[in-house]
């Protein structure tokens, strides 16, 4: 009877720290994966809100045309970088690859710089933009800390 209970205990994946098909521990960071998922949805809403705010600024405010074009091009660049960052972070965490996760952390730097640009350095910064970018920078801070911790865990593990 004790042998059956022992087998049932380790048959449940949430009670064991080992991978299903092997005996290697699962090192992926669940909080980091949750942050990647939430940040993906948040950035999609952020992108739509920024586009709508640029339309508002272009129509209502005396926004210089050259600055508006520059800000929209930077937003498109920001979107591409964020997509790459989330992809490499997502795959690096789930596949337990420190190089892909390092690329994600490296791409985090230009994304944070672009977020600071939209937070402080535009011609007109709306309050909504300030709040949205401040929340995005909080996401980046948490992802940086968890990403560096996860990279160190992956680097110390003996995965063959």
From Swiss-Prot:
Keywords: Cell projection, Cilium biogenesis/degradation, Cytoplasm, Cytoskeleton, Membrane, Transmembrane, Transmembrane helix
InterPro entries: Uncharacterised_TM-17 (IPR019184)
Record has Transmembrane helix as a keyword: yes
Pfam families: Transmemb_17
GO cellular component, one term: cytoskeleton
Top-level taxon of origin: Eukaryota
Location of this chain's protein in the cell: Membrane; Cytoplasm, Cytoskeleton, Cilium basal body
Membrane topology of the entry: Multi-pass membrane protein
Disruption phenotype: Ciliary phenotypes such as pericardial effusion, hydrocephalic brain, curved or kinked tail, gastrulation defects and other severe defects in left/right axis.
Keyword Transmembrane helix: yes
Any one of the GO BP annotations: photoreceptor cell outer segment organization
TM helices/strands, residue ranges: 41-61, 68-88, 101-121, 134-154
Protein function: Part of the tectonic-like complex which is required for tissue-specific ciliogenesis and may regulate ciliary membrane composition.
Quaternary organization: Part of the tectonic-like complex (also named B9 complex).
UniProt protein name: Transmembrane protein 216
Taxonomy of the source species: Eukaryota, Metazoa, Chordata, Craniata, Vertebrata
């Amino acid at each position: 009877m004790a042998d059956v209970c022992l087998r049932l205990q380790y048959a449940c994946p949430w009670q064991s720290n080992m991978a299903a098909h092997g005996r290697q521990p699962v090192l992926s960071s669940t909080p980091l994966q949750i942050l990647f998922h939430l940040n993906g949805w948040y950035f999609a809403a952020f992108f739509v809100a920024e586009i709508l705010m640029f339309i508002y600024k272009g129509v209502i405010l005396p926004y210089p045309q050259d600055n508006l074009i520059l800000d929209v091009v930077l937003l498109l660049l920001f979107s591409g970088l964020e997509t790459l960052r989330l992809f490499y972070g997502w795959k690096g965490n789930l596949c337990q690859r420190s190089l892909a996760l390092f690329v994600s952390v490296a791409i985090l730097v230009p994304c944070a710089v672009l977020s600071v640009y939209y937070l402080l350095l535009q011609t007109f910064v709306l309050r909504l933009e300030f709040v949205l970018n401040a929340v995005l920078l909080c996401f980046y801070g948490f992802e940086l800390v968890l990403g560096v911790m996860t990279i160190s865990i992956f680097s110390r593990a003996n995965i063959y």
